[in-house]
Amino acid sequence: MLSGLVIVDKPQGWTSHDVVGRMRRLAGTRKVGHAGTLDPMATGVLVLGINKATRLLTYIVGTSKTYTATIRLGETTITDDAEGEVTEARTAAHITDDAVAVGVAALTGPIQQVPSSVSAIKVNGERSYARVRSGEEVKLAARPVTIHRFDVHSITRIDGGRVVDVDVTVECSSGTYIRALARDLGNALGIGGHLTALRRTQVGPYSLDQARTLEELAEELEVLEMSLAARSLMPNRELSEQETTEISFGRRIAAGPGAGTPDAATAEKPAAAFAPSGELVALLADTGSFAKPVLVFAPGTGTGTGTGQAK
């Protein structure tokens, strides 16, 4: 059974669910999921899991993300991006490069961010975007996010400065809305702002260099095999034959070298355990002097398919 990750370069106009549906047909299985939604207008890295690899997705969702984006200052939209109608316009002619830099700096580091109201966040069981589209005014609670990097690459004045386009790179924690960053930068400058372009270039350890378009995947389905996917995602632990046998049957073994330290493997941040053959056997968490399996992938005594890239 084919199992592994597929790194897709999502096309503009497709929902993440659309891409999952396409991959189900390409892989010949219903068991396909993704590790974090991309808005339809956005392009770039969308990590999919096939069959057993869907169990890795929960550990990818919480990783940092990197984006390139264009923020338009001087116009506010109902969706905080170019998909929505412009609700307010103010001239950006007086906005200097230094003012943009100050605004960006204030939005870098740990911040409290109010998500865009047109989002998939549920309010009393209903998606926020559905409430907004029905005419309801939705106010979402702020949540903590971290903007690790917010770099300005270029500032372009259009129509004599009526609007200003700012090209940026953002590296951020999971749960950050780049649309909300655009909105907040515009609001801080007193002229409003929204997102006009967004491309995700990295999700955790998986980058755009590894991504393939749906057309390329239709010609050759390139799958990152489970062992390789886990090795790049989390700390590794190499097992002996005896340890492999114990873990394969759900039994505990001696804790890893990081036990009792901040580097200890936990259920939320486990270590990937590999048989001598290189096969991914399980994900482990250290509890006291023992390590126990959080997930077991491979039954048996340590023989396996090794590592490699399945196609």
Curated annotation (Swiss-Prot):
Pfam families hit by this protein: TruB_C (PF09142), TruB_C_2 (PF16198), TruB_N (PF01509)
Reactions mediated catalytically: uridine(55) in tRNA = pseudouridine(55) in tRNA
Single Gene Ontology BP annotation: tRNA pseudouridine synthesis
Composition-biased stretches (Low complexity): 254-268
Active site: residue positions: D39 (nucleophile)
CDD domains in the record: PseudoU_synth_EcTruB
Enzyme class, first EC level, given as a word: isomerase
Protein name: tRNA pseudouridine synthase B
Organism listed in the record: Paenarthrobacter aurescens (strain TC1)
Organism lineage: Bacteria, Bacillati, Actinomycetota, Actinomycetes, Micrococcales
